[in-house]
Amino acid sequence: MMIGETRRTYPTVEIPPWPVLEELTTSEFFSPVMNSPDCSMLEALAGLQRYLPSNEPDPESYPDLLGPDSPIDAYSCDHFRMYDFKVRRCARGRSHDWTECPYAHPGEKARRRDPRKYHYSGTACPDFRKGGCKKGDSCEFAHGVFECWLHPARYRTQPCKDGGNCLRKICFFAHSPDQLRFLHTRSPDRVDSFDVSSPIRARAFQLSISPVSGSPPMSPRADSESSPMTQSLSRSLGSCSINDVVPSFRNLQFNSVKSFPRNNPLFGFGSPRGSILGPGFQSLPTTPTRPGNLDIWEYGLEEEPVMERVVESGRELREKMREKLHKENCMDRVAQDPDQNLGEAPDVGWVSDLLM
């Protein structure tokens, strides 16, 4: 104790401060309208803010939101990935991790050229792989992995092999049918253009990730789904309409069926039980078929010249068949009916009718 200081009989009591969440502003405490309805409403709102749930999603409750394509990430949209990712220069002044930044930095290997400004394809440049390209930014090929796979002609045009289990920060492939991109070569005002929400997108995604089998478990419908043949035609024909191609294609195949011989193994497809048009136009047969898709264009082009040669050489073929049957009868290889006349010649008229 200091000299002259009185002894205190009671200890000092420390009063804790008010919590910040429960404090109101000073103007509200000393306001002359403290007991007004507006003041009581502010007090009620201040008390409810601690118990009301937040509008922002909880990443712990929804682990899918933490993925590379989560809606929380503003840089995961297709437009930003194709045209702005590692293209736009970074505006940060301080040092930071370049791999975590979506923008381009001086001297960075992942830097991309703007595909809207520089006209280059999605094919990798062979000279750049060897060590350096002399053309530089004027090269018509892609320099690096990011320019190759983030190019608008290749980005998310193929499904990801990992699907929903992909953990890559930047994935160049599609993880769902909605993410699969189709390259539109036709004008947007056409009525028969592909719809983003149509079943063709989901069907194409399933066909691209599923192995090729002999017969599918169920017959696809022509009005709701597209066959692989129709999809290949749509990609090869470009701006031509599928609705215009199908009628002409049917007429072509109908004429080809007429010219097929009855001993052809494909003749059963032209019967009422099946059709040579394939699974995209009617139901598939229930009997097992050979694996793989039937390339009708290729088969038709191969068979027609053979049939022409057969028709041209029909007389020679008939003579050979008559000679062969005559030799077999002479060598007693053909079993004869006891009631049949031995001098009667075999009936080969059906061969002539077949080849006429």
From Swiss-Prot:
Presence of the UniProt keyword Lipid biosynthesis in the record: no
Keywords: DNA-binding, Metal-binding, Repeat, Zinc, Zinc-finger
Zinc finger (C3H1-type): 120-146, 155-177
Pfam family, any one: zf-CCCH
Compositional bias of kind Polar residues: 225-235
PROSITE patterns for this protein: ZF_C3H1
GO biological process: regulation of DNA-templated transcription
Gene Ontology cellular component list: plasma membrane
A GO MF term: zinc ion binding
Start and end residues of each stretch annotated as Disordered: 209-235
Protein name: Zinc finger CCCH domain-containing protein 49
Organism: Arabidopsis thaliana (Mouse-ear cress)
